[in-house]
């Protein structure tokens, strides 16, 4: 697919496995990667929506496939990696985007089950998908990008579990960056601010309410758009960032600058 105003070639020849890519930021990353020439595998529990994303990408000239995946389960993570390699011949890029919010309550009101679910999906999910991808990424000298959050840097009341998992992701990426630098694998995190997604709309009631309440907390005065995060993910997966590993790319509208 030749470069156009909507399509580029920054990721031409790349094969990307993206978790949590049926909706929100993950979907935007999958679509932007495909627009930049990557072959994309969507790994998500929501198979129906995943297939609609695949159809959309293919209808726009891209290459995509999907697999049902619970990232908190080792066998699912392993199968997702195998599926990507079988479908497209190799694996060069992993993006860990699957995540869950926890109930907004202080720790003494948070159930152990909700705490464990946050750990299992947000943190263990990225560990597992990375673990099984790394043997293939050693061959391709590829990249891993874990989607963290501005909440890895600053905290919000009632969100201790979410903040803890996202902060841990940043440290996980730094550790892996050191472990695999000699193998040519680059590992970074990307930390969004408040982004206008369906998940955020559900949390606030609707996007207008989210924008009214949370938008002003960002110095730029608004929520970000999913594609603004996706463009950052393209940068981290591309040859534009070849001297970048163990870093956290903040795209947060200035949220952490207050």
Regions found by a protein language model. Name each.
Residues 88, 127-130, 136, 222-251, ...:
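C-terminal substrate-recognition "lid" of short-chain dehydrogenase/reductases
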Residues 3, 182, 194-218, 228:
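A glycine/serine/threonine-rich, flexible loop-to-helix segment
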């Amino acid at each position: 697919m030749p470069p156009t105003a909507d399509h580029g070639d920054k990721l031409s020849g790349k094969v990307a496995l993206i978790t949590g890519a049926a909706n929100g930021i993950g979907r935007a990353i999958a679509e932007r990667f495909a627009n930049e020439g990557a072959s994309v595998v969507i790994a998500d529990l929501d198979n129906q929506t995943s297939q609609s994303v695949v159809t959309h990408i293919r209808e726009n000239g891209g290459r995509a496939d999907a697999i049902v995946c619970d990232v908190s389960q080792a066998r699912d993570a392993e199968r997702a990696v195998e599926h990507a390699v079988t479908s497209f011949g190799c694996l060069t890029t992993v993006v860990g985007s699957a995540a869950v919010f926890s109930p907004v309550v202080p720790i003494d009101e948070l159930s152990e089950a909700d705490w464990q679910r946050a750990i299992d999906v947000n943190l263990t999910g990225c560990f597992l998908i990375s673990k099984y991808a790394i043997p293939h990424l050693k061959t391709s000298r590829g990249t891993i990008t874990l989607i963290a959050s501005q909440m890895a840097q600053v905290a919000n009341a009632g969100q201790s579990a979410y903040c803890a998992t996202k902060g841990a992701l940043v440290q996980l990426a730094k550790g892996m960056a050191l472990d695999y630098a000699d193998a040519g694998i680059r590992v970074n995190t990307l930390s969004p601010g408040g982004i206008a997604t369906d998940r955020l709309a559900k949390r606030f009631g609707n996007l207008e309410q989210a924008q009214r309440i949370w938008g002003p907390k960002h110095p730029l005065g608004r929520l970000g758009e999913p594609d603004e995060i996706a463009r950052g993910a393209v940068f981290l997966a591309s040859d534009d960032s070849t001297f970048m590993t163990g870093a956290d790319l903040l795209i947060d509208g200035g949220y952490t600058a207050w």
